[in-house]
């Protein structure tokens, strides 16, 4: 009986350090989690090659220094085609290799689309920034240009990419909301760009709109297809996206034929419009980018008011892209602060 009592005392004395050890381990785990999340999301705008290189220079892949844009002789002799990875009406795109770096070689598909091809190239040159794919080289004589290669392809692959084991940890509201911010940031840049006020015309449906953007391996959104960006001239009559009638709910109301079924569509009679057509489409693109991720419903709740403003039928009543961007960033910061506070409360 005495031995049992002694054993019980010893068990209590030995159990106290074990409990303290467990509490200490839990505390350390929470601290590590806090610093991990803080480090992971504290910088939502990492530096890009555009900000690291002077104008008309590039740095891609494993390059340690910037190089001038490649010219015709360098492209002809140094860029080797590997395989066809994309094809549209305007151009074909080949995975290619240059000095051990993977690049994308774009080649004019047909002479009848030469104007569109050259327009896209001029926009790619003029809009080089953190919002746009990196230009590597140009040879107008051969109707080709070279850009940085992004293996994940267009942002249409987002859901399947984030379902892969290597990217599954990135399938969070942080990643997806940042992609939406990237999209709106590009529109804000496009609407006040060095090349004037530009409108995304290759955006008549959701699939077409998303196909204009690449998904980078670091889960950033980059504008890639710039073949249809007409300029809105101040005091002008606006722009028209193509010469055919547009239909559907995705396009803005002002892009629809306004004179009813009693009058046949006429390109000459169709009124022009401006960059506010891009604003109308922001909520639909955002819903795709957010998907069904945990926390997405909270984000949609916070964005409900700006969604409503973007969907105003009167184009002039819609917010600017910069105003939408400000709201999106505010929601991101608010969500991050709430998450950080929850982690701090656990400590």
Swiss-Prot record:
Q: Per UniProt, what is the membrane topology?
A: Single-pass type II membrane protein
Keyword vocabulary terms for this entry? ATP-binding, Endoplasmic reticulum, Kinase, Membrane, Nucleotide-binding, Signal-anchor, Transferase, Transmembrane, Transmembrane helix
Membrane spanning residue stretches? 15-35
Full protein name:
Protein O-mannose kinase
Query: Some GO term, biological process aspect, for this entry: which one?
Result: muscle structure development
According to its UniProt record, where is this protein mainly located?
endoplasmic reticulum
Q: Which family does it belong to?
A: Belongs to the protein kinase superfamily. Ser/Thr protein kinase family. STKL subfamily.
Gene3D superfamilies under this entry? Transferase(Phosphotransferase) domain 1
EC number of this enzyme: 2.7.1.183
Q: Which organism is it from?
A: Danio rerio (Zebrafish)
Q: Name one Pfam family in it.
A: PK_Tyr_Ser-Thr
Catalyzed reactions: 3-O-[beta-D-GalNAc-(1->3)-beta-D-GlcNAc-(1->4)-alpha-D-Man]-L-Thr-[protein] + ATP = 3-O-[beta-D-GalNAc-(1->3)-beta-D-GlcNAc-(1->4)-(O-6-P-alpha-D-Man)]-Thr-[protein] + ADP + H(+)
Topological domain, Cytoplasmic: which ranges? Answer: 1-14
Per UniProt, the enzyme's principal EC class comes to: transferase
Tell me where in this chain the Protein kinase domain is found: 79-347
Q: Per the record's keyword annotation, is Transmembrane included, yes or no?
A: yes
GO cellular component terms, semicolon-separated: endoplasmic reticulum membrane
């Amino acid at each position: 009986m005495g031995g049992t009592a002694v054993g019980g005392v010893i068990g209590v004395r030995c159990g106290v350090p074990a409990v303290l050890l467990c509490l200490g381990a839990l505390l350390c785990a929470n601290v590590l989690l806090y610093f991990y999340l803080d480090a992971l999301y504290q910088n939502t705008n990492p530096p890009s090659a555009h900000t690291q290189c002077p104008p008309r220079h590039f740095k891609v892949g494993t390059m340690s220094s910037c190089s001038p844009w490649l010219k015709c002789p360098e492209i002809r002799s140094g860029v080797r085609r590997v395989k066809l990875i994309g094809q549209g009406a305007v151009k074909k795109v080949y995975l290619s290799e240059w000095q051990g770096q993977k690049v994308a070689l774009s080649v004019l598909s047909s002479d009848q689309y030469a104007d569109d091809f050259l327009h896209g190239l001029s926009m790619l040159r003029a809009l080089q920034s953190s919002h746009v794919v990196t230009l590597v080289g140009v040879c107008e004589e051969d109707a080709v240009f070279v850009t940085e290669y992004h293996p994940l392809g267009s942002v249409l692959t987002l859901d399947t990419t984030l379902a892969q084991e290597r990217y599954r940890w990135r399938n969070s509201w942080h990643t997806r909301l940042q992609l939406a911010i990237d999209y709106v940031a590009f529109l804000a840049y496009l609407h006040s760009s060095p090349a004037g006020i530009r409108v995304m015309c290759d955006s008549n449906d959701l699939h077409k709109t998303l196909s204009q953007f690449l998904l980078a391996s670091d889960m950033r959104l980059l504008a890639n297809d710039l073949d249809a960006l007409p300029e809105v001239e101040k005091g002008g009559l606006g722009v028209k996206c193509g010469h055919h009638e547009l239909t559907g709910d995705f396009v803005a109301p002002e892009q629809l034929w306004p004179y009813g079924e009693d009058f046949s569509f006429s390109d000459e009679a169709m009124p022009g419009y401006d960059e506010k057509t891009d604003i109308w489409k922001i909520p639909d693109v955002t819903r795709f980018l957010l998907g069904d991720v945990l926390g997405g419903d909270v984000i949609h709740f916070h964005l409900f008011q700006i969604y409503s403003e973007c969907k105003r039928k009167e184009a002039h009543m819609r917010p600017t892209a910069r105003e939408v961007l400000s709201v999106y960033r505010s929601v991101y910061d608010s969500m991050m602060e709430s998450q950080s506070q929850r982690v701090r409360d656990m400590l």
